[in-house]
Structures are given as structure tokens and as C-alpha cells.
Amino acid sequence: MLSGIDYLIVIAYLVGIMVLGLYFARFVRSADDFFLCGKSLPFWAVGMSIVATDISAMDFVGVAGQSYRFGMAVGSFDWLGSMPAMLLAAFIFIPYFWKAGLYTIPEYLGRRYNDYVRAVASLTWIIFFALDLGVLFWATAVMFEPLMGWKPWFSIIVTALVVGLYTFYGGLTAVVMTDVVQMILMFVGGAAVLVVGLYHAGGWGGLTDKITAMGEAYQNHFKLILPADTKTPFPWTGILFGLTLVMSNAYMIGNQAIVQRCLATKSVWHAKASMLCGAFFKMFIPVLVMFPGLIAVAQFPGLEDGDQAFPTLVKNLLPPGLRGLLFAGFLAALMSTIDSILNSTATLWTKDVYQRFVKKNASDRHYLMVGQVATVVLLIFGVITSPLSDRFRGLYVAIQTFLSFFQGPVFSVLLLGMFWPRATQWGGLVGLVGGICTSALLYVFKDHLFTIQDPFLYVSWWSFVAGASLNVATSLVTRRHPEERLAGLVCRLPRDLRGVSEVPTC
């Protein structure tokens, strides 16, 4: 349980972050301010916000839980997945999106294909964010119950009220600037657990000796790459095809919560630099969220639920004061992701669905109100759906499973739309819907198709292949778009322009 000094630190953090968020609400005077900060953010703030958004409370609990069960292989999601994808995004995709003046990625898909593709892509991300929010709230309950003795529903509602208040009023500016503080707290708190945990384990040498001495079941715990026939969710084939080629690129290039920050920067240079800044910080994330799971294997073997590894370390190893600091860092990780999801989903709903299909020519003030109402509705939905997360084998598996349903198809449509002029509006729609249906079928028959229990990496890969194949096949038998309609929508090399004006290059 937390001590008096711990409670003082946590309360000071909550009050401070609330005041900071509401302070930046003063600068929100229009829908553009709420959704894109008036394109005024510096690269360093956006880079830190990207990391704070990507690394949530789910990672502290869920990634530690996966490393407790399977070892270092889960670290490949950052080192082999996210970092290469962020470099690709920084130098090719983000500058292109920034120059196009986009609010959302589905907005580009609507311009390139049609409104149906835009609506389907936007709704899939909205559904994912709603489910993701439930997972994050459940991570709160997992952490709060052993440390504070709070019932799950009480923990979830308190968290929802605090983060919802400043996101509702402050928009993206409040989200990003509070994320800067929260990322610093996240790193400090995570480092405290790592240092104290390694000390109790006897250093790195003591940690490796203890785990390798525990028997054959733990021999792969220090391997980043696992064989193709492993029973874990991380075979090298899945890491290469499902993670490195599809999921990581789809997440860093097509995720509204990530890309929206880059689109809110001052210039193309700041947009590029923000993603590179984020990639630099991402190098250290596995150290903070994965290694505690390994430490828990050595210090507390035999936990029935791997997701209890991180809370168990905090409860049993950290002294008063440090425990409160870590708990504040955990809350920072949680709130930085929740506020990002709320703002990004409000943007998707307002710009891609409401403004496009419900009320096209309303006032700027009206769209600001719609975005704020969407924030409240999503918050309530996340609270209600949070218990669904307990049905999965770990919080991390829940998130990756939700992502694998649609990331491959959406990324295939985006990729072909940007780099293949022959892709047609019907090709995009058939590829997107067909790819998502493929994901659903793969999960229905997963016990007959895959040898691992949680095949989200394979589902991502094969749904990407299906979506791309259906897009190509349908495009080849349907009428292509005229060249002038593609101006500014297809990424071309300078030598391919042949006099076509106003076409962005890559």
C-alpha cells in the first residue's frame, strides 16, 4: 500500500497536471486550435508527446507481463519494429502529409479514393481507440488495486474524470504540453524500478544467473529473436512479416494519435524532426518496460498472472517516496495515452464522419462543440467496455489483437494509394473491406491455421496481403482515375512528373 508521502506525491502530480492542462485551454479559440494547435508546436514537444502517447500504462503492466512469461522477445516491438518505422515515416510520409494540409489520415484516403473508404478507415480507428481506452482503464485497475486497495470501478472513474476534464477544454495543445511533463515522469519512475530491481537481483549478472538456473522453460528469456516454431506470440517469421513490414509501419504512419501531432508542428522540418526525436527516445523504452518483467521472474517466480509482475515489484521493492514517484510516472503514462486517444478520436469523428456526412457547412464553433461532445462519449464508452480486457491472456495481447483486425488492410490501401497511380476508388474499398473480413476469418479459424495461441502478427501480415491483392485485382478491372485527379495525391519521383504540375514528390 502507498504511504502518506506517496499519496502526497501522487496528489501533487494530479493537481499539477490538471492546472497545466487547463492553463493551455486558454489558447483554444477555434476547431483548428482544438485539433491541430494552429500548427504551432515545436518538434521537441511533439517528439516527447509521441513517445508518451505510444508508451502507455498498458506497456508498464502489459509488456512487463509478456517479458515475465516469454522474455526479451517482446522488446523487438520497439527495437525491430517501431524505430525503423519511425525513420520511414519521418523522411517519406510525414512531410507528404504535412504539405497536404491534412487533419487525418482517412481524409487523405477520401481524397485519393472516395468517401466510403474514408468513412470505413475512420470508423475502424474510432472503434479501435474506443476498445484501447477500455484496456487502458483496466490497466489502471490492475495497478491501483494492490497498491491502493481501490475497487476497479472506482479507479477507472477517477482516472476518466481527471484526464477527461483537461482534454475536453484544452484540446491538442493541452494534450501535447502535459505529455512533455508526463514523459519525463514516466522515464524517472521507470528508471527507479529498474535500478532498485537490479540491485535486489544482484545486478545484471545476478539476474541472468537466477533466471537461467530456473530450468529449460526459461532458456529463451534472454533471446530477442525466437525460432519460427516457438509457441510464444513472437516467432521470427511473425516479427519480420507481421511486425516489421506491417504492424509497426501501419501504427507509426497511419495512427491518427501519432500522425496528428506531427501535422500540428510549425513546419515540415519540425514535422520530420519530431518523429526523429521520438525515435531517439524510443530506443530506451524496452529497458524501462521490459526489464522489470525479467526482474520479477528472478525475484517473484510463480505469479499466476504475468500482468501482476510490475505491480508486485513496485509493492515489494520500492521504498516510500520512490513508490509514489513511480506511481505518478505510471499515471503519467496512462493519462498521456488516454488524452491522446480522446483528442484523436474526436478529430476523426468530427472531420471524417460528422462534417463530411452529417453537417457540412456549420460554424467553426459548432465543430469545436462536436469534438468536445465526442470526447465525453468516448470516455463513457471506454469506462463501460474496460472489463472486456480481462478476457485476454494479458493486456498487451488484447491491444495487439485489436490492432491486427484492421492495421494490415488500412496500411495496404494507404500504401497503394500513395505509390500506385492505377489504384481505383473501388479497388481501395474492396481491398479495405476484404482485408478486414480476412482478419475476422483468420481469427475464427485460428486454431486450425496457426500453431500459436495469439497469432496477431500472422493475422496482420495475411490481412495486409489480402487487402493489397484485392485492391490490385479490383483496380485492374475498374476504370482508373484521370491523371489530373491524382495531382497532389500520388507520391512520385521527380523523373516521373513529365510536366505534371503541383504534384508533391517523395
Where are these regions (language model features)?
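Membrane-embedded helix-loop-helix hairpins and adjacent transmembrane boundary segments
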Residues: 1-506
